[in-house]
Structures are given as structure tokens and as C-alpha cells.
Amino acid sequence: MQTNTTVVVASGRALLIDPAWLPDELGALAAELREREITVAEGFATHAHHDHVLWHPGFGDVPRWASSRTAELARTERDDLVAALGPDFTPDLIDLMGRVDAGTPAFDVELIVHDGHAPGHTAVWLPEPRVLVAGDMLSDVELPLPFWPHDVAAYERALDLLEPYADAARIVIPGHGNVGTDARARLDADRRYLADVRRTGRSDDPRRANAGMDAEYELLREILAATTDLS
């Protein structure tokens, strides 16, 4: 799994967004921040999936924020989130996972809350550098994934909400995939993919060739076929 962690630094203090993913990577990130004399001041989780609500003791006991729906799901779905972690996570990492509260970071950010990909999913806009931290959307390697409750319309509304930020962004950071300068092109590709499958039941999106994506493509076809006449 290719994952991205975003570290927003101001005057030696950091907002840590979606620290991930493996225990040794979390430990290495904590060590790197110490070496650079950067103190974690706050954390933020973009959504309540197990690889986005992680933490490490080396980051410190600081406020960890999320949207209200994400914070709620992190509590109510905790058993499933823990089960998804796997055997390499130690008890201290398991205990820290998902301990987020509803709130907004003190850093200069704008939160863009929607229900695409997951209920309460949140993108983070950094206005001065014009960076869009997109969570699990706008990926160059993953197809659009309208996960539980498989609400494709909510995903399409989320793309509409993200559009002005994608237009303004100099940099886009997806949860999985490569950092890029092509936020609007990625948004257009996601819209085209969903529209093609909705209209014809097919898509030739090149991301289908990436690991796990063809299965997600087939799932989307099933979801849309249940509500759309694809003949």
C-alpha cells in the first residue's frame, strides 16, 4: 500500500495529517521529526479507515482532530478498525489508534467535509501554499472508491465540492498515490470514470491495471447496475 503522511510545519510546530502506515514507518516518522527538532502540536484524521486514524507515542499526547462523523465512527467502529490493523501493531499503537475528537486544528487550514469515500471524509486546504490534502480522493493510482455505504451520488457531490480547490491548488496530496500538480486533471478523470460506468457500464481508465483496482471497478459496476439501466 502506497500511503502519504502530510506534515504541516510552522515555527517548528507541526500539524500531522494521516500519519501512516506500518509500525516501523510511524516510528521512523517520529524519529525524523525529533531529529529535525519539529514538535507535533496537533493531529488530523481525514476519515475513519484504519490506515488514517493511526498515531505513535513519539508524536506526543496532543489534540487529534477529525470531523464529527469521523470521530463518531472511530468510536463506534473501533473493533473493526482494530481488526484491520494486523499482527504487527503493538498494544500501545492499537490503543492510540482512532483516539480523535471532533474539532478544527489551530493551524491555518480550511476543512472541506463531505461524504465521498467515507461518511465525514475531510479534505484539508492550506490556503497560503495552495496545497490540497485530499484524503482518499484525487489519486493517480486508485480509482474513485465510494465505500460504505456505497453512495456514488455522495462521491459525485464531493467532487463538486472539491472542484474550486482543485482549480486553485498548486499541489495535491492524495492518501494513496503520488503527490502532483494536476489536481483538476485528476478530478476530471474521476468524474469521467464514474460517468462512463454509470452511462455504459464500462470504463477504460488506466488505473484499472493497478493492484486491486479491477475488483473495485467490478464492484462499482454492480452498484450502479442495481440503480441504472446499462443496456
Q: What does each of the following model-derived ranges do?
A:
Residues 6, 17, 79-89, 185-193:
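Conserved N-terminal glycine/acidic-rich loop preference
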Residues 164-171, 178-231:
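Accessory terminal helices/loops
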Residues 26-27, 31-104, 195-196:
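Active-site HxH/HxHxD metal-binding segment of metal-dependent hydrolases
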Residues 17-20, 41-51, 65-68, 113-116, ...:
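Active-site neighborhood of phospho(di)ester-bond hydrolases with catalytic His/Asp-centered motifs
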Residues 1-36, 40, 92-164:
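Catalytic core of the metallo-beta-lactamase
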Residues 22-24, 48-54, 71-74, 119-121, ...:
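Active-site environment of divalent metal-dependent phosphoester hydrolases
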